[in-house]
Amino acid sequence: MLERLLTISLEQRLLILLGALALAGAGIWAWSELKIEAYPDVADTEVAVIVKYPGRPAEEVEQQITIPIERALNAVPRVLTRRSRTIFGLAVIRLTFEEGTDDYFARQQVLEKLRDVDLPEGAELDLGPLSTPVGEIYRYVVEGDGYSLVQLRELQDWVIIPALLQVPGIADITNFGGVEKQYNVIVNPAALEKYGLTIEDVEKAIQANNSSTGGNILSMGSSQLAIRSVGRIRSIEDLQYTVLKSEGGTPVFLRDVASVELGALMPSGVLGYLDKTRGKESNDGVEGIVLMRRGENPSQVLQGVKAKIAYLNSRVLPNGVRIVGVYDRTDLVESTLATVGKTLFE
């Protein structure tokens, strides 16, 4: 049998050579498509419900947010465990499902039950990203010569994160550091009393004037004009000229009872990092953590992330601003493969 096989191989050299090349090509393709991880992902299917209720104590958050959501989620099928945590201004409810449960099925069931929950005004509900505890594959910082933390945070929120979320396989980008811009309204109590106003009146007036509304179509001959009201606040001047009330036909503006200045939202923490490769240490900055969607190929996702970052650095971000990687899962994967290969060889 072996002699006949050798004879056929010698007689059909071209066919055998082509077959060997095809087999080698298939092997190379299979290797490139192989999902190589530093450690296996053995996490159960889990859905996290995250509700922000700013400024509320833990007891109030638990009564108005956590307990109603827990009751609604009791009817979700195939759930193994339910855990919740309530802190100041935040509630997190985690559901762990039976082994083999499809991720999208689990999230759909949770969303259907959440529709029946009546949350108080001001509460923001969201589902956690479709990732796992080992889904963190890349970290970067945003640096800019001559740019403030407010400006870097704006670039992160409005340019960098939306662009990176377009990369296939990305579940979410977690934002750390920076300072969020806000308008500070410093009210003069004596002026409020003079015009017969309260803090609630000022708050309602600002909310009512910070919106745009749609109108209708006005026909003018063969043309049509779209009518709309543009009221979105875009600058300090827009805010200063917000009308609070009218006395005898004379408007009372916000600037008459308060001063308006550009400020920053009080941060809940500070980001610091040490880049040993460049010998740079920073006590503040803006960082992004890239989370991979469950079941994706980390090598391919990382290639897409790096390509997008290179594009942003060269074509999109202003001069002096750059995205610098500080953690890359590729290094860990290569180190793990080298260790495994060395062990097998020995």
Say what each PLM segment does:
Residues 1-345:
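Membrane-proximal extracytoplasmic
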